[in-house]
């Protein structure tokens, strides 16, 4: 299989194998409306296998969201067919509007329009808790 290089855009590399569609969903990128290439279950020396997402044209992605859903991913910015910048997402201390609280008694569940906000409690376990009711977040 051959996937050619892109001239201008971004490459999200080292996405956990089989999760690229979920990553696109969390990044709010619609595959039906965006020129992109998905390479799934590619060989990786570091991880065994990985997914790669290539997005043509300028697309502003939220590195905090990417750090939350695909912590080990890297982002390469491509201009004129060459990588001009490499970015490494970090695990965010706070996430807003990415996931929803599962607690049926949480104010965010009962009241429409309240932003879903979570804070990092334990970085090794990737544990986030709701700012309002302290319920653990589920990805």
From Swiss-Prot:
Cofactor: Zn(2+)
Positions with a binding annotation for Zn(2+): 101, 106, 130, 133
Annotated GO MF terms: metal ion binding
Listed SUPFAM superfamilies: Aspartate carbamoyltransferase, Regulatory-chain, C-terminal domain, Aspartate carbamoyltransferase, Regulatory-chain, N-terminal domain
Domain of life of the native organism: Bacteria
Record text on cofactor binding: Binds 1 zinc ion per subunit.
Gene Ontology BP, a term: pyrimidine nucleotide biosynthetic process
Keywords: Metal-binding, Pyrimidine biosynthesis, Zinc
Disulfide bonds: none
Name of this protein: Aspartate carbamoyltransferase regulatory chain
Native organism: Bifidobacterium longum (strain NCC 2705)
Classification lineage: Bacteria, Bacillati, Actinomycetota, Actinomycetes, Bifidobacteriales
